[in-house]
């Protein structure tokens, strides 16, 4: 089977447009999510070499990305290297933790220092 999974970044049209623009410009080369979401959704953790269709707010594929590195770390241990690759905020791990704790809380997820986070680095094909 040659089907690829889809990936949607951001939870509003405006935020998704912003994040997708960063991906297409080569400034966003990573994304993160809570490991428990994969369990809740019955989805496997992303794996190196896996391809994803990047969707816009209408659900239309705008690019294909491939996972180049996948790590699972405690929220408190997300490194600056990842924050830089993610391309958001001031590009520091401290800003990553602050902004993502707020963003995820808005979606009902209260992140803790030991919450397991999947870090996926990727490139656009």
Q: Which functions belong to the PLM regions below?
A:
Residues 1-64, 68-125:
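Mixed-charge, low-complexity intrinsically disordered regions
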């Amino acid at each position: 089977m040659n089907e690829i999974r889809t990936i949607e970044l951001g939870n509003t049209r405006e935020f998704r447009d912003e994040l997708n623009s960063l991906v297409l410009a080569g400034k966003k080369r990573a994304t993160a999510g809570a490991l428990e979401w994969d369990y809740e959704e019955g989805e496997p953790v992303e794996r190196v070499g896996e391809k994803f269709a990047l969707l816009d707010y209408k659900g239309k594929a705008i690019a294909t990305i491939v996972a180049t590195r996948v790590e699972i770390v405690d929220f408190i241990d997300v490194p600056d290297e990842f924050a830089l690759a993610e391309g958001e905020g001031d590009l520091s791990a401290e800003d990553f933790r602050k902004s993502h704790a707020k963003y995820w809380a808005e979606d009902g997820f209260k992140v803790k220092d030991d919450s397991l986070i999947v870090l996926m680095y990727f490139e656009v094909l």
